[in-house]
């Protein structure tokens, strides 16, 4: 059973598999190689991917996207407050965690970001299963290199809820470097800078690639909250202001108008990557008012100027951390859809004194490509190209504990290789102190109050002794997923305590994960029931229209009038029933089909036999077969719905 690689993106996701010595990026049921990270809830069903994004203007409040901007964060995170201004769906606090509120089948529901992401992951899993023709459980999932511990852990939980065994969480730029290194058959030692600007996150990583098989990450930097959506937001604000100026109407109060404007803005942004001007035309945008305008590339660049410039700071930081200067970088590789923006490219090129940028890998698919390779390696694939690949990644943030006076004492420095393990000895702060509280933080600031708290645990039962005498050994063990285990041991008694940092405030408990796994299965069952219902409805519709058409077109004398009227009456009754019972259950559709078949089949058979008698294989023969298949319907069960 193959393992798959999934690029779980803010706006789009992508899945790949390594087989027969190469990576296949797998297209979804719509034929697209990337799938929107959207989930929609309606009165009757749940939609994921393209169908969800396609109906967003009709159902903005119940269509959820950007779960990656919520995952592993706390509700009071200022970034979330900023995003909520742009989201049509509701985000509420549930014990300090953000939850998304929607209406589904007439009921109010609340979902954790992990659940929404798990639904997207389930869609990617099903896409791969349909292509490979077998069930899949093992996967590698990618995250931005700058994701912190809680964001990584939450992504792993999302995989678990989707029924996946997550072999490894790997960093997106590292996966892209893997794709680049294997695709280009690099020779010798090369320093490669991966510039990854996607829909919602931004990463820069510098790697040394040796003979195209040893991939060593030297440094990483980034912003987990900068990407194409932020550029869209600037353009939407500009267009909404223009609409208000021209027509004295503020469309911001209307989620549907705002959504249609956002879709047009996103399209215009894409156009501006290849043209210097984009036209926006939206009929009846708000209160019946049409909106026609033009946006020039120069205006778009001015609107996003500070955001574009901000992409260079992490580049500088990554170079400093890797102790390299600009001239030592051999290749600059662009990844992520937003790197198609000409201004982003020109700023980066100027920063590197006119050096050519490498545009040779597909920016939308490179990360999934690398993840698929890593999945094959971890599941023991020994084929030619990948058997020698060794990937050495680094920790994006420093990790440490709080010591007297609120000082951050680091045990693991940022950009140290992972997996890694560090031990330091600490002591008590007061005489006869019976226990110590180990508070774990991540971040680069000197004081813990400015860093991100990951978790706390207490080590008690320390024998009475003067301050500074007891020896407490604290060990940090950072695994290959970038997830931390911390243990503390009092040396004289041998008492020990350890935790996997599960970010008590932000993480899901095991019970919550189990509940979500069960709910995910329940939703999958509901989706399956809905699919079967639609299949039964389509079978009935198809049969009734085929029979009706065959009878209406039957040549004169082939069918007596009474039979013809009897069939037509029955068909018209069924069509009327269909029109007034659109939400009937599968069993009702099946029952109607059976009833209709019982009534029409003998007449159709008679008509068919007469036709065959009149002239074997005459036109009637085909009509009969088309219309009935004599009882059981075996015609097409798919109907195009416009």
From Swiss-Prot:
GO terms for biological process: chaperone cofactor-dependent protein refolding; heat shock-mediated polytene chromosome puffing; protein refolding; response to heat; response to hypoxia; response to unfolded protein. Transmembrane segments: none annotated. Changing residue 489 to R: In strain: FrV3-1. CDD domains: ASKHA_NBD_HSP70_HSPA1 (cd10233). Disulfide bonds: none annotated. The keyword DNA repair does not apply. Forms a complex with Hsp83/Hsp90 and Dpit47. Belongs to the heat shock protein 70 family. This is Major heat shock 70 kDa protein Ab.
């Amino acid at each position: 059973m193959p393992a798959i690689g999934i690029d779980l993106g803010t706006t789009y996701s992508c899945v790949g598999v390594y087989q027969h010595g190469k990576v296949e990026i797998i297209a979804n049921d719509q034929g697209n190689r990337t799938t929107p990270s959207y989930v929609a809830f309606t009165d009757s069903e749940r939609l994921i991917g393209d169908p969800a994004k396609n109906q967003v203007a009709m159902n903005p409040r119940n269509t959820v996207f950007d779960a990656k901007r919520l995952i592993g964060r706390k509700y009071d995170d200022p970034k979330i407050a900023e995003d909520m201004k742009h989201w049509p769906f509701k985000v509420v606090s549930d014990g300090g965690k953000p939850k998304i509120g929607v209406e589904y089948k007439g009921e109010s529901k609340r979902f954790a970001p992990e659940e929404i992401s798990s639904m997207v992951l389930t869609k990617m899993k099903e896409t791969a299963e349909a292509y490979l023709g077998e069930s899949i459980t093992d996967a590698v999932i990618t995250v931005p290199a700058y994701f912190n511990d809680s964001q990584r852990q939450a992504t792993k939980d999302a995989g678990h809820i989707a029924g996946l065994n997550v072999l490894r969480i790997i960093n997106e730029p590292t996966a892209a470097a893997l794709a680049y290194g294997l695709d280009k058959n690099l020779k010798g030692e090369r320093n490669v800078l991966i510039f990854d600007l996607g829909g919602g996150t931004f990463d820069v990583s510098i790697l040394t690639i040796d003979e195209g098989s040893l991939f060593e990450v030297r440094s990483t930097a980034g912003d987990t909250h900068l990407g194409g959506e932020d550029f869209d937001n600037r353009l939407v604000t500009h267009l909404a202001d223009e609409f208000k100026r021209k027509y004295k109407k503020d469309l911001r109060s209307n989620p549907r108008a705002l959504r249609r404007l956002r879709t047009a803005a996103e399209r215009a942004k894409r156009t501006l990557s290849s043209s210097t001007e984009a036209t926006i035309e939206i009929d009846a945008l708000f209160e019946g008012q049409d909106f026609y305008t033009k946006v020039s590339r120069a205006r778009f660049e001015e609107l996003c100027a500070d955001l574009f410039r901000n992409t260079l700071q992490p580049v500088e930081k990554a170079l400093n951390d890797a102790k390299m200067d600009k001239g030592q970088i051999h290749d600059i590789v662009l990844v992520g859809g937003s790197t198609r923006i000409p201004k982003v490219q020109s700023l980066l090129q100027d920063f590197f004194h006119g050096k050519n940028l490498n545009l040779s890998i597909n920016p939308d698919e490179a990360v999934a490509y690398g993840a698929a390779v890593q999945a094959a390696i971890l599941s023991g694939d020994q084929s030619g190209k990948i058997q020698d690949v060794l990937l050495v990644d680094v920790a994006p943030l420093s990790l440490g504990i709080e010591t007297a006076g609120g000082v951050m004492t680091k045990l693991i420095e940022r950009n140290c290789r992972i997996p890694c393990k560090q031990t330091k000895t600490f002591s008590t702060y007061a005489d006869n102190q019976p226990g110590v509280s180990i508070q774990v933080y991540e971040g680069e600031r000197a004081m813990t109050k400015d860093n991100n708290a990951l978790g706390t645990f207490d080590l008690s039962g320390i024998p009475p002794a003067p301050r500074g005498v007891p020896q407490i050994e604290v060990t940090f063990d950072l695994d290959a997923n970038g997830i931390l285990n911390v243990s503390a041991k009092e040396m004289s008694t041998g008492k020990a305590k350890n935790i996997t940092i599960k970010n008590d405030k932000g993480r899901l408990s095991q019970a919550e994960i189990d509940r979500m796994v069960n709910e995910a299965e329940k939703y999958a069952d509901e989706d399956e029931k809905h699919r079967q219902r639609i299949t039964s409805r389509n079978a009935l519709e198809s049969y009734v229209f085929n029979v009706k058409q065959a009878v209406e077109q039957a040549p004169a004398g082939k069918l007596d009038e009474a039979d013809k009227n009897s069939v037509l009456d029955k068909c018209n009754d069924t069509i009327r029933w269909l029109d007034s019972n659109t939400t009937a259950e599968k069993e009702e559709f099946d029952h109607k089909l059976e009833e209709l078949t019982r009534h029409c089949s003998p007449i159709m058979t008679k008509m068919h036999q007469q036709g065959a008698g009149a002239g074997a294989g005459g036109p009637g023969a085909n009509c009969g077969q088309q219309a009935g298949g004599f009882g059981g319907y075996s015609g097409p069960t798919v109907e195009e719905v416009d």
